[in-house]
Design a protein with these regions (language model features):
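Metallo-beta-lactamase
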Residues: 131-193, 315-329
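Active-site HxH/HxHxD metal-binding segment of metal-dependent hydrolases
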Residues: 89-156
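N-terminal signal peptide c-region/cleavage motif recognized by signal peptidases
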Residues: 19-22
């Protein structure tokens, strides 16, 4: 990693928002960055175009706690108590700035925040694969687990959320955000997951839900995604991506359950490099590492270990970034 990259990673790890590019195309805010265990900091990000004000939620494991932390870190500098009234600043971001959600798959650590906060949310669409939308409809918004705040499914339909399952690999509009999206399937230990390619103004950003490596999943889903992103890189459109690395390299492959390690991620990114133009084509690519699973073992620091293992073998020149809850970045 370059000196600039190391400084960026250190600043982000300290919890300070940072802009790398004066002509940034997207702003990303981390509402939650962990891959489980602690319910207040679960996977959830916001993204918007730099010429728009409304965000799309990228998963929703922890929403309101993350908004609170982001406000503390001035990640929403235009939101004040005065211009939020009669709402709180947290309420203004939640109800007014988040215009839509994309849910990558139906696991609880990716949507618990949306479910819990739904009674006070404003009307907005939720996008996901057909499998994800069906999971929301059947197993969450069903008046057994939770009241039905959607516009379909069983019992009274309260209609806060419009459930949408766009066709895979076809472009659609992401609510009122001004962003377009395309959903691609991923494999997550036998569970259907997905990646969202966000685009606007001939620029793009990729958000990955949970995924295992193709060789372990007996799948070609990541290979298909790398082909798409390789072309985005060749066309100089891809501004960055968020992808999981849940475990350190010490985790046995038969205990990954559809997740990545640093070694597996680097192997997959090597495949992307081939589609992006060959050696050196990923140099400087900003890759946010997400979904690290915290440990309850004394002295263990999986975040630091994953960071070390990625950098130790980073022969691709990728700029690995580690956001903390509440941080914002421009791409």
């Amino acid at each position: 990693m370059t000196n600039k990259g190391w400084r960026a990673a250190l600043v982000i790890s300290a919890g300070i928002g940072l802009s790398f590019n004066a002509s940034a195309g997207f702003k990303v805010v981390a509402l939650g960055v962990n891959g489980g265990v602690e319910e207040g900091n679960l996977t959830s990000y916001l993204i918007r175009s730099d010429d728009q004000t409304r965000y799309v939620g990228l998963d929703a494991g922890s929403v309101l706690p993350g908004i609170g932390k982001a406000l503390e870190k001035s990640s929403f500098p235009d939101i004040t108590a005065e211009n939020s009234a009669p709402l709180t600043p947290k309420g203004a971001v939640f109800r007014n700035l988040i215009s839509a959600y994309f849910i990558s798959h139906g696991h609880l650590d990716h949507l618990a925040g949306l479910i819990i906060a739904s009674p006070q949310d404003s009307k907005k669409p939720i996008y996901g694969s057909a499998e994800t939308i069906d999971t929301l409809r059947q197993y969450y918004f069903n008046w057994k687990v939770w009241p039905n705040f959607s516009d379909s499914g069983s019992g009274q339909r309260l209609g806060t959320y419009r459930l949408n399952a766009p066709r895979p690999e076809q472009r659609f509009s992401l609510g009122l955000s001004g962003l377009d999206g395309v959903i691609y399937p991923l494999s997550h230990g036998g569970v259907s997951s997905s990646m969202l390619l966000v685009s606007r103004n001939n620029e793009s950003f990729a958000y990955f839900g949970d995924t295992g490596a193709d060789k372990l999943e007996k799948s070609r889903h990541l290979d298909a995604v790398w082909r798409v992103l390789g072309n985005e890189i060749k066309q100089k459109r891809l501004k960055g991506l968020i992808i999981e690395t849940s475990f350190t390299n010490q985790m046995p492959e038969n205990q990954l359950f559809g997740h990545l390690t640093p070694a597996l991620l680097l192997g997959e990114l090597k495949n992307l490099e081939g589609y992006a133009g060959g050696e050196g084509s990923l140099k400087g690519l900003k890759v946010v590492i997400s979904h690290i699973k915290p440990s309850l073992t004394a002295g263990a620091d999986p975040r630091a270990e994953i960071h070390h293992q990625l950098e130790q073998n980073n022969h691709l020149g990728v700029n690995f970034l580690f956001m903390q809850q509440g941080d914002s970045l421009e791409f």
